[in-house]
């Protein structure tokens, strides 16, 4: 996260750190057995760390899990920058609520442009160098009209199941290593960090976030055991 500060140790009990291959992502615990993240965070040898704050000084209640199952919008794992960048991970065993572990509810209402949104993660804190912090950083950005992202990224289709969020003058943004983490708008879990400008946090180049509300039926279907659930087109 660019332009943020160290998160309060108690404000992110749902935030998970995902390691895969040589990379890291974020993710969100949505109940004791399921994590929601970005499809592009899929990889080999995935590890999911829960109840984390400082990587160097671990919380006593931190837990480590591996995926038992992974679910994508369609079995072919077809996703693009602006479509279906979402993955549900079933943990190999449930986690109990504890001081630093608790799920985040799915949204009960759709996101509204103009909302203030919180981003968080262990991603780089420099837009031009890979400077990964020991603790997660948090920042507040704004939910912008989709057309702002279309102006910045002409390859975006006329409509998509993504949210556009950032600060028009730049300076605050999610960045490399934050992918898969949550976008929390007006207290509701509305987005998943997907992609954005390179370098991060440039003026008029907001980030693109998978719209969680649009995928609720799929998320709830998969969790309920309906593996035929499909994502919206």
From Swiss-Prot:
Tissue and organ expression note: Expressed by the venom gland.
Active site: 40, 85, 179
Keywords of the record: Blood coagulation cascade activating toxin, Disulfide bond, Glycoprotein, Hemostasis impairing toxin, Hydrolase, Hypotensive agent, Protease, Secreted, Serine protease, Toxin
GO cellular component terms attached to this protein's record: extracellular region; secretory granule
Description of how the protein assembles with itself and partners: Monomer.
PANTHER family: KALLIKREIN-1, KALLIKREIN-RELATED
Protein name: Thrombin-like enzyme elegaxobin-2
Organism whose genome encodes this protein: Protobothrops elegans
Source taxonomy: Eukaryota, Metazoa, Chordata, Craniata, Vertebrata
């Amino acid at each position: 996260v660019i332009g943020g500060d160290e998160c309060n140790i108690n404000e992110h009990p749902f935030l998970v750190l995902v390691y895969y291959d040589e990379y890291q992502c974020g993710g969100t615990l949505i109940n004791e057995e399921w994590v929601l993240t970005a499809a592009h965070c899929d990889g080999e040898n995935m590890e999911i760390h829960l109840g984390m704050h400082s990587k160097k000084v671990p919380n006593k209640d931190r837990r480590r899990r591996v995926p038992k199952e992974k679910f994508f919008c369609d079995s072919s794992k077809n996703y693009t920058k602006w479509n279906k960048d979402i993955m549900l991970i079933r943990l190999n065993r449930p986690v109990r609520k504890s001081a630093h572990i608790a799920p985040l509810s799915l949204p009960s209402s759709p996101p509204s442009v103009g909302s203030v949104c919180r981003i968080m993660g262990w991603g780089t804190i420099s837009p031009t160098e890979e400077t990964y912090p020991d603790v997660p950083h948090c920042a507040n950005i704004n939910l912008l009209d989709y057309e702002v992202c279309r102006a910045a990224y002409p390859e975006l289709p006329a409509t998509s199941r993504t949210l556009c969020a950032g600060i028009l003058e730049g300076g605050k943004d999610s960045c490399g290593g934050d992918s898969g983490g949550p976008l929390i708008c007006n207290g509701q879990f509305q987005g998943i960090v997907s992609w954005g400008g390179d370098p991060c946090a440039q003026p008029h180049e907001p980030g693109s976030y998978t719209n969680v509300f649009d995928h609720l039926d799929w998320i709830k279907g998969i969790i309920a055991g309906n593996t035929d659930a499909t994502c919206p087109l």
